[in-house]
Swiss-Prot record:
NCBIfam families: bL25_bact_ctc (TIGR00731), PRK05618.1-2 (NF004128), PRK05618.4-1 (NF004138), PRK05943.1 (NF004612). The keyword Iron does not apply. The lineage of its organism: Bacteria, Pseudomonadati, Pseudomonadota, Alphaproteobacteria, Rickettsiales. This is Large ribosomal subunit protein bL25. Part of the 50S ribosomal subunit; part of the 5S rRNA/L5/L18/L25 subcomplex. Contacts the 5S rRNA. Binds to the 5S rRNA independently of L5 and L18. Belongs to the bacterial ribosomal protein bL25 family. CTC subfamily. GO terms for biological process: translation. This is one of the proteins that binds to the 5S RNA in the ribosome where it forms part of the central protuberance. GO terms for cellular component: cytosolic large ribosomal subunit. GO terms for molecular function: 5S rRNA binding; structural constituent of ribosome. The keyword Ribonucleoprotein applies.
Length: 203
């Protein structure tokens, strides 16, 4: 599981806070933003709407450590919230969280299901039921994985993969879940197979 590459976003300090002033920024192609975090003062920013939207659509901002270049001063951050215009589907505001290198953070990491072609259950027509598409982990910023791979090799119809079956990279830990060993994915028989089995049983 490869560690993710750093994403860089350019930002500038923002003095204006009033609603009309921020709307004027948007009309000029900028996005109002803020960065905050424990032990840090809130800092108001502006971003290039074109640059940020391009990074977002490429998937580069999902669970990624970001290097914010704030008028030449570099800070590490995570995207914590994005507000969208309900009609235009454009970004209206972005919340970042400061990240201190060396400290551990909680972050949701997407799951990637690999080796479907090596699953006998899927080859026999089984259906892959994904119950969980991301999991929360705790690690230092430099250890954040791009994805966590779930290997389907050898899995038969009726088998499941649970959280305790997943191997994490060194330095990455699962965050406790209310259900200790929850199910991530199962391989079930197709409906037609189930109906056929039921018919044979009734006969």
């Amino acid at each position: 599981m490869a560690q993710q590459e750093m994403v860089t976003i350019n930002a500038e300090l923002r003095d204006v806070k009033k609603k009309k002033a921020m709307q004027a920024l948007r009309e000029k192609g900028s996005i109002p933003a803020v960065i905050y975090g424990k032990g840090h003062d809130n800092v108001n920013l502006t971003l290039s709407a074109k640059e940020f939207t391009k990074q977002y659509k490429s998937g580069a901002l999902s669970a990624h450590l970001i290097e914010l270049d704030i008028s030449g001063k570099k800070e590490y951050a995570l995207v914590r919230d994005i507000q969208w215009h309900v009609v235009k589907d454009t970004v209206q505001h972005v919340d970042f969280q400061f990240v201190d290198k060396g400290s551990e953070i909680k972050i949701d990491i997407p799951l990637s299901f690999i080796n479907e072609s090596k699953s006998p259950g899927i080859k026999l027509g089984g259906v892959l039921n994904v119950l969980c598409r991301s999991i929360t982990v705790k690690c230092s910023p430099e250890k954040i994985p791009q994805v966590i791979e779930i290997d389907l090799s050898g899995k038969m119809i009726g088998q499941s993969i649970h959280i305790n079956d997943v191997k994490l990279p060194e330095g990455v830990k699962f965050v406790a879940h209310e259900e200790e060993n929850f199910t991530i994915v199962t391989i079930s028989a197709a409906d037609s197979d189930v109906e056929e089995t039921q018919t044979k049983t009734e006969e």
